[in-house]
Amino acid sequence: MTNGGYEQAKAQRNALEKLGEKIPGYRGFQDRELRREVDKLQREHIANELGRLKAAVRDKTRGYTDAGQIGALNGFDRLDRSLDGLSQAIRFADYGASGIFDAVKIGEAELQRLYDFDLSILDDLAGLEGDIAAVPAPGPSPNDAPATALDKAQQRLRALDDKWRQRERVMTDVVQS
């Protein structure tokens, strides 16, 4: 979700919320809560995308299992566990616990920086999806093993995991800007 996600959510407020804007201090509280909600939705979207990729990995794993090529299954299992770990870390992160949602006034430029960071994560997910799609179907010979493609996907997933862990620092930097 980009800055447009926040603006779209803001535009969908009901009459009671709009009335609350008239109460001193309420608007800042309301905006912080809205940012928390948008952040939560963004994280859920990323976690769901990782779950979708995990399902694709399991489909490919099933193909190798059905073909009796069990030697390749370790690589699939590692990728599956890594996808699950990152998905859970993102889904259950303490949203709103960082300074981005405190009473500090955050400018549009700082928010845009955070949204750009989140967009780059979505771009990385698209790359990971391509890596998983590139894992070959089981072939008749052991030379068709998926190890190289699985390693490439695992490397991209590790980089994505590292990037996600940097998000807290980006959020802190946004507040200090």
What does each model-identified segment do?
Residues 1-65:
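Leu/Val/Ala/Ile-rich N-terminal alpha-helices, chiefly Sec-type signal peptides and the beginnings
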Residues 2, 51, 55-58, 78-81, ...:
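A broad, low-amplitude sensor of folded, mature protein cores
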Residues 8, 12, 30, 42, ...:
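Residue-identity detector for glutamine
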Residues 9, 13-16, 36-50, 73-76, ...:
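Amphipathic, non-membrane alpha-helical segments in soluble helical-bundle scaffolds
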Residues 35, 65, 95-98, 169-172, ...:
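Structured alpha-helical bundle/scaffold domains in large eukaryotic membrane-trafficking regulators
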Residues 55-149:
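Charged linear interaction tracts used for macromolecular binding and regulation
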Residues 138-177:
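Preference for long, well-ordered alpha-helical segments
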